[in-house]
Amino acid sequence: MALARCVLAVILGALSVVARADPVSRSPLHRPHPSPPRSQHAHYLPSSRRPPRTPRFPLPLRIPAAQRPQVLSTGHTPPTIPRRCGAGESWGNATNLGVPCLHWDEVPPFLERSPPASWAELRGQPHNFCRSPDGSGRPWCFYRNAQGKVDWGYCDCGQGPALPVIRLVGGNSGHEGRVELYHAGQWGTICDDQWDNADADVICRQLGLSGIAKAWHQAHFGEGSGPILLDEVRCTGNELSIEQCPKSSWGEHNCGHKEDAGVSCVPLTDGVIRLAGGKSTHEGRLEVYYKGQWGTVCDDGWTEMNTYVACRLLGFKYGKQSSVNHFDGSNRPIWLDDVSCSGKEVSFIQCSRRQWGRHDCSHREDVGLTCYPDSDGHRLSPGFPIRLVDGENKKEGRVEVFVNGQWGTICDDGWTDKHAAVICRQLGYKGPARARTMAYFGEGKGPIHMDNVKCTGNEKALADCVKQDIGRHNCRHSEDAGVICDYLEKKASSSGNKEMLSSGCGLRLLHRRQKRIIGGNNSLRGAWPWQASLRLRSAHGDGRLLCGATLLSSCWVLTAAHCFKRYGNNSRSYAVRVGDYHTLVPEEFEQEIGVQQIVIHRNYRPDRSDYDIALVRLQGPGEQCARLSTHVLPACLPLWRERPQKTASNCHITGWGDTGRAYSRTLQQAAVPLLPKRFCKERYKGLFTGRMLCAGNLQEDNRVDSCQGDSGGPLMCEKPDESWVVYGVTSWGYGCGVKDTPGVYTRVPAFVPWIKSVTSL
């Protein structure tokens, strides 16, 4: 019995030793330590098959314990099966070939080469550590092979010191940003000296990001705030990590954070663009990616807006089209033609275009671009878009520039023909250029981007002239600058005067458009060549506009008698201007002529509106007073007692009067219908006489009327022979554009005998 007890004690002691020496023999559900509470940094299973979840870093290697997320044990692993390379701060993340592992959540669902074991439990994990998912073999990971395809490989668990931690900061996505390294316990940046696309290739490879690697300079993604860790990085592009590249020692540099380096690793998808064949990263032949192949873009219909969109998508703010001959040749397919962008696209293939591969071009027509960064606050980069708006043709208009995503205007302070020469040169025009000020082509509606622009006239682009900060100004849109390119001055000679005089009256020698003073719109220059204005001479004022008038011949002007009520009929107090368009801008066809004689109808009384008509004789020898030209021509007189409602059509009023907001600086025009005599009598009762007529649109939403500044101006109607006849002189009315109160005009046909007796016309 004693012997049996001894044998039993020996057996139990042996089993106890074995149990203590082999904890693996316990049930896999047994935990030798108390289970810790759940944490956002750990994921728990009732077995050791799933590795702990860790927060994702771009390359999660070697982070000090104080800054590492807590990693808790999930159980014991047999020492004969290495489930992962290293532990804690030295986990492995490269194959035994030295190629970086892909993140588990970046592996596509379909693979050409199957891995050694199921990896379903790792699918979607936000890290790239080597693992043996089923615990049955060596740790492995996915990587991208030399052909760019996803493959798998075993990991080298003795890979030594971990690579530096890298992250991208300040970009719009995880594929771009300022490059930052983690070294000696803190994040820091890289100086952009020698920084190029080869360096970007290595960074993208080390991060496990595929696609187009592009280097960025001058703190493109913003300035960092930590130390500058590296300088003079000179990778060949074939290295597996930045550690393998020639570079400065850690912490050695001669830079500031304005030179922080950045990269973008753009995924290769259809519509991605790049610049190729240039001497730098910001210039080259424009190429677009489609179905696994790069191709070029034909320049048919290419515009500045297309350039802006392409450069913006490439990360720049502006650009200009460059000759493709400046860049290396291409034997790639021509993918796109007839591209037209609106400026709002977020992908190049959102621009209007032909179908992929449809074109009628050769590579001599490939689009070449040079892109530029944003303004630095003092000047704009060459090539930012400019345009001319609201001119009569594409060679003239209000100057607008595209800055920070918005079209805006330029203030006309100091604006001269030298500025116009630069604008026209940038737009490709080589002829004479003329500046226009005071919103000559109308007021813009966007921001005012520039003021106090200074040009010598020799600059290639407006950007070279800008001296004041973008957006700083002390102007309103009434001071918007404009230009006329390829300007041709056409003044009539004396022989030309005789030709025009002999050819008759009421001729419009320039193109016309019929738009609608209240309810009206700007006229074209020269569209109403008989339009004149009566002005005060400086002895009585500042030469300001008093009334409109109508040129009847080189020496006679028709206007309203009430225009002389305030300042009398002394001819030396007045001047007449003809050929005018913008009241504040001197123009080549404009003439200001003194007054020799004022003839007011003898029946006119200042306290009444009847007989409101006057004639003005201009100063000049014989019958040569105003020089006639395409912009200065006489109107025709009607027949005596002619009834314009039956013989005329297409009637217009013109002038610089009240537009509903203010007095206009540019000549206004408005189409108005002549109204029946009975209608006018009903509205104005005894105030309306047989020597008057009324006209105007009476609808609530379409009222057009002449106002105070247009007094004395013409009411013109077109005859069937296309000559224009003055049927009315703007006289009076109840306000401007008031409902059911049309403008009243002196009926010119009733005064034809008197006009001819005074003027001998």
Curated annotation (Swiss-Prot):
Pfam family, one: Trypsin
Tissue: Most abundant in cerebral cortex, hippocampus and amygdala.
Domain Peptidase S1: 517-760
Active site feature: 562 (charge relay system), 612 (charge relay system), 711 (charge relay system)
Domain Kringle stretches: 85-157
Molecular function GO labels: peptidase activity; serine-type endopeptidase activity
Reactive bond homolog (site feature) positions: 516-517
Signal peptide: 1-21
Domain SRCR as annotated: residue spans: 166-267, 273-373, 386-487
Carbohydrate attachment residues: 93, 521, 569
S-adenosyl-L-methionine in keyword set: no
Keyword hit for Aminoacyl-tRNA synthetase: no
Family, as annotated: Belongs to the peptidase S1 family.
Function per UniProt: Plays a role in neuronal plasticity and the proteolytic action may subserve structural reorganizations associated with learning and memory operations.
Protein's name according to its UniProt entry: Neurotrypsin
Phylogenetic classification of the source organism: Eukaryota, Metazoa, Chordata, Craniata, Vertebrata
